[in-house]
Amino acid sequence: MIENWPKKPEGSQWTDDQWKAVVANGRDILVAAAAGSGKTAVLVERIIKKIINEENPVDVDRLLVVTFTNAAAQEMKNRIGEALEKVLIDEPGSQHIRKQLSLLNKASISTIHSFCLQVIRGYYYMLDVDPRFRIANQTENELLKEEVLDDILEEEYGIEDNTIFFELVDRYTSDRSDDDLQRMILALHTESRAHPNPEKWLDKLVEAYDVEGKTIEDLVYASYLLEDVKFQLETAEQHIRKATELAMLPDGPAPRVETLQADLALLGTLSSAARESWTSVYEAMQNVSWQTLKRIKKSDYNEDVVKQVDSLRNKAKDEVKKLQEELFSRKPESFLRDFQDMHPVLEKLVQLVKVFTERFQAMKRDKGMVDFTDLEHFCLQILSEQSEEGEMKPSAVALQYRNKFAEVLVDEYQDTNFVQESIIKFVTKDSESEGNLFMVGDVKQSIYRFRLAEPGLFLGKYKRFTQEGLGGGMKIDLAKNFRSRHEVLAGTNFIFKQIMGEEVGEIDYDADAELKLGASYPEGEDVAAELLCIQQTEEEVIDGEEGAEVEKAQLEARLMAQRIKAMVDSGYEVYDRKTDSMRPVQYRDFVILLRSMPWAPQIMEELKLQGIPVYADLATGYFEATEVNIMMNVFRVIDNPMQDIPLAAVLRSPIVGLNDEELATLRAHGKKGSFYEVMSSFLKGAPLEEEKELHDKLEWFYNLLQGWREFARQQSLSDLIWKVYGETGYYDFVGGLPAGKQRQANLRVLYDRARQYEATSFRGLFRFLRFIERILERGDDMGTARALGEQEDVVRIMTIHKSKGLEFPVVFVAGLGRRFNTQDLMKRFLLHKDFGFGSQFIDPRKRIKYTTLSQLAIKRKMKMELIAEEMRVLYVALTRAKEKLILIGTVKDATKEMEKWLDAREHSEWLLPDHIRAGASCYLDWIAPSLYRHRDSEILLELGQGSVPDEIYGYDTSWKVEVVDGNTLLAPEPVQEEKQELLEALREKKAVPLESERKEEVYDRLMWKYGYEEATSHRAKQSVTEIKRNYQSEEGSDNAFIKKLRAPIRTRPRFMEKKGLTYAERGTAVHAVMQHVDLKKPITEEVIREQIAGMVNKELLTFEQAEEIAIEKVISFFDSDLGKRVLAAKSVEREVPFTMMLAAEEAYQDWQGQSGESILVQGVIDCMIEEEDGITLIDFKTDTIEGKFPGGFEQAKPILEERYKVQLSLYAKALEKSLQHPVKEKCLYFFDGNHVVKIEE
């Protein structure tokens, strides 16, 4: 088989390993593709080669290609399509290639969920599911779960003598709520659904607690923890050995060697016991006795060495003490009793989970909806059936798919879960040695365990498969990196060769795993990788842990801002592959990677202060926006006005506008009862004179509130929201505030959220509020509108997870001193795919609780998995850099941290000791000890001591390591020494002597006159309407300009709101109709009225505006000669916005400034028609003519011509500039009297 593989073509750019991955077949193949190794290109080439194979061509729809995201699937299709089109250019007559191009859109190139959906749609009749099902919204799913679970628990509470249930409640709930019990049920449900057979997994979980007739040695938890015992005892032994070496130095405390050797013997005894059984270790631990150190005269020995010896011995003793207290302070039988006692309670818990799953599935079925886990399980249900032994085997449908697919290719295989693996297994051949499964991925980049991805699947096959593929599957390593410079790759290798191993890290970073240089770059300057370790300021700016975090973010942000500015200003060069040359670095070339985003806003702020454009996709802040917060409180009050805090917030908001004094006055009217009750009581009585204004405000709001509450019971939620916006005027109000457009956009998003909610199976305001609460509980807050886009020349800030698959010339990895998130390990109960359920033993009667064996084992296992995941996250971060890698971390006490990192200094092997790697609490705890052993780390070497093996010390990589004093970063800019004296004089308000050498400087400053003063009295940006007014009056003067700077009143005062529309509002309504009326429909009263109603429904007009429209005047326009020309025109454009530059002297008739100054002019053209002989410009006017001018229209015409001449001339100029065609005619149309005025130059 191997001999038949095509040979690599002469001059091919594929490496040998890549070519092997393209052509190898005949068995299951696992490709371990390192970062930047071109795995996607290999995958596409393999598919193309299969399609165009001359001897055995495969149709593209006979391949199943599974990708991690929809975007990746689309990119794969595009690449395959482009490759096939290239083949077609060489073989234009190939019907086979043409067929493949036509089949491509139908090909199974998709995510696993899309494939599942395809299977379910095809075989829905094998399931109890409506074929018209829809995919549930995540929040809707959460609300359904809550509803089902509430019903189940309510039933359980109502059952008499439900002893075990109440035992469960007593153990796992508080006296305030049963939230913890609900969380346990939901967590067990979720975890079970990550397994092919959820019920079987749940049953095994209960079986593990059935210890009848078992000893502690029979428990999987004890077996695993014994491995941990060995690990900790080995760590203790290493400490004692190191202490012994130091004691035997010429100036070491030699008399203590005898005691240290006795310690080693003791630890040896414990280790031997750990290799035998739990009981053996327990018995040995009861007999632990440490000898007392011999007293010595410390002045006879090196004091530092003595301290180190004592410290190392104490560390060893602490390791043993920790084991004694956690694991061996109790007899083995007592651990077994815990399991016996907890077994019936756990059995009841699992029963509740099964009932919940059954009812939840039934409710989704009734509502015709499925979620993503359902897609996987339904697909698996179709593809599998149960054998006589009770095991899952391929169904007839699965066998059909096996016959259909010539090969199944899985991208990002390291992120597959157990259910997905089963689906893939059922549509591929049974035998790995003769299989047709091709898997590509990099387990070192598996960073989605929180989504239940299982890297162990990849690891298992990687260990099982061989490079030759003899007797099983084949593995191929793609280690060449075509992305990064040597300095980036060597720097990454140097760290990971020391920290990633099978025991701690889950995979050996061996020669096969190392990154190998595949890219060629020109020689560059300052390309060494860097570690910048910031020493936090001695006195924190803000007290407390949160304040310290804020300061760390600020320190790192300032350092990064300095480096970015310096690199940009100095013209630091990066390589441009498109031009094959070096070019100056741009802001877009930088990225700042963070483990999570809490620091991002502060980093953005610091960079902006330095004038650095920056972009971050902040998916937070929406619900914190003031306008959204206020509206949410309004809806909470509509739902339940008895809530004091939301009601007070609304009363205090601009909607009602009470001040603190008025709020206090209201509360004084009723010190008991809710705010709503007090408000209702206050409104029933007659107000005092001084309380009348308060009474009016509250009465207005109270009446609105009652109307809203009634409306909410009968109408849709989205209609309610828009009604509140309109009746309060709040939507218009926020539009007049700073960032008004964004605020209005935020309110529209809330309306859209309501529409989305109403598309689910839920209805009503109360449920909507719960819907939003669920979104916030999940941390799914949305980001507010963005000021910068992703394609602009900006520095980007993103999480390491978001950066996966991307690359950047210069990468900052920040926050390396932040502690790992271990909150999951602190939960009251723990779940694990292999070890099941673990929690404290709780006895509510005796009011005691203590740690159980299962909890200890699961916690230890989860910690080791977390450590391995964090290593992989760090690997992803470091491998994003193409040319320059800069690592930044902040520590509170650099000297103290250095002492801790010093443990690694003299370790003789590449891989650091397990206890150092497993004991890391942040990324710096891996990076710094590794760099401690490199020749370029002078700053670290000065603080440490000892020697490093030559192979490690002289490793071929370049590093710059620097410890930065945080005080220098937070200090203000230094004031020049020569100015100090002058500053002191100014502070003391001393006059400058007449004979002073500074006399001329002071005089020049006092007499200075701004050279562009004239320009400051005129706007740099004007609307056409404002320019028109400038020509008509003195509004262009300084005073008028200053008055214009005052914020305009966007809405009328409340006392005017019910007195009809103003002239301006009527004009706006008429213009809206003229903009949106459908010119293709008949212009009749009935049709126009119908269209106006449609505009109201679309919220283009309000009811009040619609009622004020004089439909007969609209019809009159279209009956006029000008209106008929509009209907007959070649093309009609309405409400055409424009912006153009205009000479200042054209815009301002009083301009006296420098010539050459330009003004930005903007406006909107009502209507523009194109006829055979040119363009005509039309402006609609609603001015009052009849009755205002005694001489009628003839008297008004010259006045109107003069009034609007400038405006239409500017419109014409703008159109001529943009269209490059002359405007033949400029017309004004006045609805009052149906008059047309033509404007002549």
UniProtKB/Swiss-Prot annotation:
Positions of ATP binding: A33, A34, A35, G36, S37, G38, K39, T40
All residue ranges annotated as the UvrD-like helicase C-terminal domain in the record: 505-805
Record EC number: 3.1.-.-, 5.6.2.4
Record flagged with keyword Nucleotide-binding: yes
Catalytic activity of the protein: Couples ATP hydrolysis with the unwinding of duplex DNA by translocating in the 3'-5' direction; ATP + H2O = ADP + phosphate + H(+)
Matches recorded under Pfam families: PDDEXK_1, UvrD-helicase, UvrD_C
Cofactors (names): Mg(2+)
Domain called UvrD-like helicase ATP-binding: residue spans: 12-485
GO BP annotations, alphabetical order: double-strand break repair via homologous recombination
GO cellular-component term (any): cytosol
UniProt KW Isomerase keyword: yes
Xref: InterPro entries: AddA, DNA_helicase_UvrD-like_C, DNA_helicase_UvrD/REP, P-loop_NTPase, PDDEXK-like_dom_sf, PDDEXK_AddAB-type, Restrct_endonuc-II-like, UvrD-like_ATP-bd
Function: The heterodimer acts as both an ATP-dependent DNA helicase and an ATP-dependent, dual-direction single-stranded exonuclease. Recognizes the chi site generating a DNA molecule suitable for the initiation of homologous recombination. The AddA nuclease domain is required for chi fragment generation; this subunit has the helicase and 3' -> 5' nuclease activities.
Name recorded for this polypeptide: ATP-dependent helicase/nuclease subunit A
This protein's encoding gene: addA
